[in-house]
Amino acid sequence: MADPTVIVVGNEKGGAGKSTLAIHIVTGLLHAGKRVAIIDLDLRQRSMSRFFANRAAWAEANGAGLPMPTEPDMGDGKTLAKADEAEQLNRFEAAFAEARNRADVILIDTPGGDTVLSRTAHGLADQIVTPMNDSFVDFDLLGQVDPVTLDLLKPSIYSESVWEARKHRAITQGRHAQIDWIVV
């Protein structure tokens, strides 16, 4: 079996719509017949995990045959959020290894903000999907933009982190290895 495609929905800004977009991508892939594994790294909110748990409960209660993703168990999110980075990475790596064996696509939903788990996930991505809204607050995610001329003055911290993930991929897997970055 070929390695699964890894999609990371990422953006350091909270409230940009990452979890909502992740849910729609997963649902579309499931209805296209793909085996999808999800990993929700927003350890405190777990919006994507909760959505699919509620969907499964509703489907079972109503006898509806809805396709569902698999989700490796990372334990209680709030407890894991308080654990040290080494423990968080151990749990994530175990979940990722399990997902690799069970899916055509692994979709990872990341939290707003810079975390060790988010950086690690970005480095594993084949595709990074970044939702943003039409505002200067969101445009600053991509880079500092002159509000009058709309010229890009410098890349943002998040753009630099995506660049670092791409650079790491090229160094570790060869110059033709790439990470696609899709901004929606």
What is the predicted function of each stretch?
Residues 1-4:
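Phosphate-binding P-loop
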Residues 6-16, 31-105, 112, 147, ...:
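P-loop/Walker-type NTP enzyme "switch/lid" segment
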Residues 21:
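Hydrophobic positions on the alpha1 helix immediately C-terminal to the Walker A/P-loop
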Residues 24, 28, 120:
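Active-site signature of alpha/beta-hydrolase-fold catalytic machinery across serine-
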Residues 32, 108-184:
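Conserved catalytic-core segment of NTP-binding enzymes
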